[in-house]
A protein has these predicted regions:
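Short, Lys/Arg-enriched N-terminal segments with co-localized hydrophobic residues
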Residues: 1-13
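Hydrophobic/aromatic-rich, well-ordered segments within soluble, folded domains that form packed cores
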Residues: 15-36, 170-190, 554, 561-566
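Short, surface-exposed beta-strand/loop micro-motifs that present aromatic residues
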Residues: 16-17, 139-140, 454-458
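Extracellular/periplasmic catalytic domains that process cell-envelope and extracellular macromolecules
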Residues: 18-22, 144-145, 458-461, 577
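Active-site-surrounding "flap" and adjacent substrate/cofactor-binding loops of secreted or lumenal enzymes
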Residues: 21-25, 29-90
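Short, solvent-exposed loop/turn elements at domain surfaces
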Residues: 34-38, 160-161, 475
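Intrinsically disordered, low-complexity linker/terminal regions across diverse proteins
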Residues: 54, 206, 212, 235-248, ...
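Noncatalytic, helix-rich "gating/capping" subdomain that lines the substrate-entry/channel surface
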Residues: 60-360, 364, 401
Length: 648
């Protein structure tokens, strides 16, 4: 049974005259009626806020795709190709005819790995055929010189949601989840031409190899400290770590030359690589690659396998039903053709008046931030100058890009092929494009998110913010909402993203996005004290579905704090400002009803605090909250002045 989390804490049903007080629980006071009305769709783990907007955008765009397909009229050749992929993915009859065979044909490449010695010769082939590897090679922005690219190596993914699940204290959850996964794997492997004995052997070996990986790869908490991914090593040093393979040969075949330096994103994993991948574990690896590769392929095969392949994630996220074939087809197509789809959505559904108004808010926030930095008491003048310089250089990407990237012109596929082969072809083009980037300069004009995505981000290595058109709607933003409501919604979110330039990660990068210590020793010491206080404010909070890890979510909490601080200052200068509207809309944007399983998953995987804490804890740090609602010491949303945290 899935228990729905309706409220912050369990309470006896009250009379209508005995409602939750805003001074005790802002989130529930604002969202209680909405939470009672919301119904979580069978194919979703949650509803409300971001998710509701995303579903609405999806409905709009599915209808757009269907109309284009029906009329055979497309705004451009990119959307024509996207709709072609949509139709292929929706063709259940063709997928049934193709069955499991496209995946089995690709997996047969593993048969060519006759001995451990052949692995290095076949690495490129395995990579381009998208088979799971014991380590990945990719090209990324060089974090210390963001104008150029670098070569990175990274460990593989694990079966459990996160590497933290392999720790002793998670043994019970681990056993339960691996039981669900094993059940799924057995049903999928039964569709292959392997004997029952081999099927079981492959699955057993996969679990053994996965256990080796799980004890070495990074946890989500470790990944959240993204600056710590940057561990440059001379290629000669990496060769000694990977001495069980011919690493230089692999690099030469992929790039045509051997890079001098490699960025080792997971030092612990690669220091133990010889224990992970050697002659004794080679068969374990082959069987792991086969099983994981097949399961990862299921969504692109027939409907029965698409259903089977989703069992594990649906079980751990509390989702009863699989995504419909139509939704799946749209999601696949709009993901692969993300920029053209986002550009179309933005041009059609995001008005120039709104874009102008939002952009005005952005620059008002940046200017206010500069003033707050100048008046900040924890920074010395030299550090303030650097911080203000960084703010001056922040790029703003609002709505959607002017044009799509050139790679979409390379997306050519055979419409008669199976869905598996079509997607395989397109992903292969992306892999090649990534490798070819190694000698090219980075492109700061590239958008991190497409226009139809309900999200926003700050890119620390470009020093810019991206706000896709899809998030720029009610309750976050509307030209019809008051300025106070918009500041409590999209304004605080914009401030949040800008604040990432100065969070526990972003503060380590300069105005060009390069890792560069621009802080004085004393400033850094005072800043670290603030970080520790922010960790403490959230750490260990008990919710009905689990305990909060303050270290894991500290950067996002700092950003929420900064976003509220800067927009509350703007409120002071806003004509007819209503702090009630500001705080109530702040709570409204975080409204979410979710399955317990999903909420538990987020505690381990999501770098953001649970929505209820984002709504309820951040305001407590600001005097405006206390003045607006006359919050007293006896109220639950009261924090003593000495414990309130305002960083920027």
């Amino acid at each position: 049974i899935n228990y729905i989390i309706r409220l912050y804490y369990t309470r006896i049903k009250m009379m209508d005259t005995d409602k939750v007080r805003i001074q005790d629980d802002l989130y529930t006071y604002v969202n209680q009626e909405k939470l009672e009305e919301l119904v979580i769709p069978d194919d979703q783990p949650s509803v409300g806020g971001f998710q509701t907007l995303a579903v609405d955008v999806e409905k709009i765009m599915i209808n757009e795709f269907k109309e284009m397909c029906a009329k055979g009229v497309y705004p451009n050749h990119y959307l024509e190709k996207a709709c072609t992929l949509f139709k292929i993915a929706k063709n259940a009859e063709k997928k049934e005819k193709d069955g499991i065979f496209p995946a089995l044909k690709n997996l047969s490449i593993l048969n060519e790995l006759e001995s451990f010695d052949t692995f290095s010769n076949m690495y490129k082939s395995l990579m381009f055929n998208q088979l799971p590897l014991p380590f990945q090679i990719m090209v990324e922005t060089d974090m210390k010189n963001t104008k150029k690219h670098c070569v990175c190596i990274q460990g593989p993914s694990v079966i459990l949601p996160d590497a933290s699940y392999y720790k002793e204290e998670m043994a019970q959850q681990k056993e339960m989840l691996l039981g669900i996964w094993t059940n799924m794997a057995k049903m999928i492997m039964a569709k292959t031409n392997l004997s029952l004995e081999d099927q079981n052997k492959y699955i057993e070996d996969t679990l053994v190899f996965d256990e080796i990986l799980g004890r070495l790869v990074k946890t989500s908490e470790e990944w959240s400290k993204y600056v710590e991914m940057y561990n440059p090593m001379k290629v000669s040093k990496v060769v000694t770590l990977l001495k069980t393979i011919r690493f230089k040969q692999i690099l030469k075949e992929l790039f045509g030359f051997i890079p001098e330096t490699i960025i080792v994103t997971e030092p612990r994993y690669f220091k133990n690589f010889m224990n992970v991948f050697n002659e004794e574990t080679f068969e374990l690896y082959k069987h792991w690659s086969y099983v994981i590769g097949l399961i990862d392929s299921c969504s692109l095969l027939n409907e029965e396998l698409r259903e089977l392949g989703s069992m594990y994630y649906r079980a751990i996220a509390g989702i009863p039903s699989n995504t419909s074939i139509e939704k799946f087809a749209y999601q696949l197509s709009s993901n692969i053709y993300s920029e053209p789809v986002g550009l179309y959505y933005g041009e059609k559904y995001f008005g120039e008046e709104a874009k102008k108004d939002i952009t005005e808010i952005v620059y008002q926030i940046i200017d206010t931030y500069k003033t707050r930095i100048q008046n900040n008491e924890i920074l010395e003048e030299v550090t303030k100058e650097k911080a203000i310089l960084k703010l001056s250089k922040i790029g703003v990407k609002m709505g959607y890009p002017d044009k799509v990237q050139d790679i979409y012109n390379k997306f050519v596929f055979n419409e008669e092929d199976s869905l598996y082969d079509v997607v395989h072809t397109l992903k292969e083009i992306k892999i090649l494009e990534n490798l070819e980037d190694v000698t090219k300069p980075t492109n700061p004009e590239k958008w991190a998110m497409p226009g139809h995505m309900v999200n926003a981000c700050y890119d620390p290595f470009v020093n810019d913010i991206t706000f896709p058109a899809a998030i720029l709607q009610t309750p976050f933003y509307s030209i019809k909402q008051t300025r106070s409501e918009n500041l409590g919604g999209i304004g605080a979110v914009i401030g949040h993203e800008i604040s990432h330039a100065f969070d526990s990660n972003g503060a380590k990068c300069d105005e060009y996005g390069n890792i560069n210590n621009w802080w004085t020793k004393e400033d850094k010491k005072r800043f670290n004290t603030k970080i520790k206080a922010m960790i403490k404010q959230f750490d260990g909070i008990e919710l009905p579905w689990g305990k909060v890890n303050g270290k894991f979510i500290v950067s996002e909490n700092m950003a929420d704090n900064g976003g509220m601080a800067v927009t509350l200052e703007i409120m002071q200068k806003t004509p007819n400002a209503s702090y009630e509207e500001y705080f109530e809309n702040w709570a409204k944007v975080w409204c979410m009803k979710a399955k317990t399983e999903f909420l538990q998953l987020l505690l381990n995987l999501d770098v953001h605090a649970p929505n209820i804490l984002r709504a309820n804890i951040t305001p407590r740090n600001f005097q405006e909250w206390y003045d607006t609602f006359h919050v007293q010491k006896t109220d639950k949303m009261y924090i003593a002045p000495g414990k309130r945290i305002v960083i920027w």
